[in-house]
Amino acid sequence: GLWGALVGVLKARFGIHEVISGIMLNWIALYFNNFMIGMSWLKKPQTEASYEVLPSSWIVILNEWKTSDAGREWLLDGTHPILGDVLIKTDLNYGIFLAIAAAFLVWFILNRTTRGYEMRAVGSGSEAARFAGINVNKNIILSLAFAGALAGLAGAIVITGAMPHRITTLTSQPGYGFDGISVALMANTSPLGVIASALLFAGLQYGGSSIQADLGAPSEIINIVIGTIIFFIAMSGAFRMLADYLGKR
């Protein structure tokens, strides 16, 4: 939340675009992460990563049962192929329920609270919101702090919900943020629409890996499909303008 608030301060006080400052601050966070992992009390010997987080903090669904002999026998006996694929081949965890709850929380705040109304007003037009007496700078900082908190929650889910349950030294950014932008565009920035678009995005990405492994087809095909979907969604406004223009002729 504090990292997102810093982006908000840069936007509100100095007019620095949040995407630009966010990318730059992400690199600062990446190198700070690498610095911290290099500390002797945090770095696991003979590795470039931290120690694993405590197993009690893992949020993998049925983790102990599916790794037991009885669980593996039940999942791999061929009578439950879908459950076997999902539970054995993926790191399905309770983070999916947290994400859905977060989407509903964001929807409620934006559509059922005064603060949410002010945030939407500032996002739609900061000058009009300022003229209406809304504190634009405060709402910019609060909205980006809230976004940063959600990003922090996602990071915690990645560590506690997926192998290897530790923080590694990074040489580049994983790109989750840009995936998030793509998902938001596919949902037309609707908090509840994000649930469906995220599942579609994840399904396409997972399907791309399966296509590459099973058929030998290039996974770039899925990236082309995703890019095409996002392109036409982003162009929807232009299509409406074109339709209005042609309708007036």
Regions found by a protein language model. Give the residues of each.
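Helix-capping/transition residues at the boundaries of transmembrane alpha-helices
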Residues: 11-13, 110, 186-187
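Transmembrane alpha-helical segments in multi-pass inner-membrane proteins
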Residues: 145-151, 157-227
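Hydrophobic core segments of alpha-helical transmembrane domains in multi-pass membrane transport
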Residues: 1, 26-34, 38, 94-108, ...
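Alpha-helical transmembrane segments within multi-pass membrane transporters and channels
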Residues: 1-26, 105
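Helix-loop-helix "hairpin" substructures at the membrane interface of multi-pass membrane proteins
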Residues: 69, 87-166, 191-192, 196
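Membrane-helix interface residues
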Residues: 14-16, 134, 189, 217
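Transmembrane helix-bundle core of multi-pass membrane transporters
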Residues: 22, 26-110, 221, 248
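Cytosolic-side transmembrane-helix boundaries in multi-pass membrane proteins
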Residues: 124, 131, 135-138, 208-249
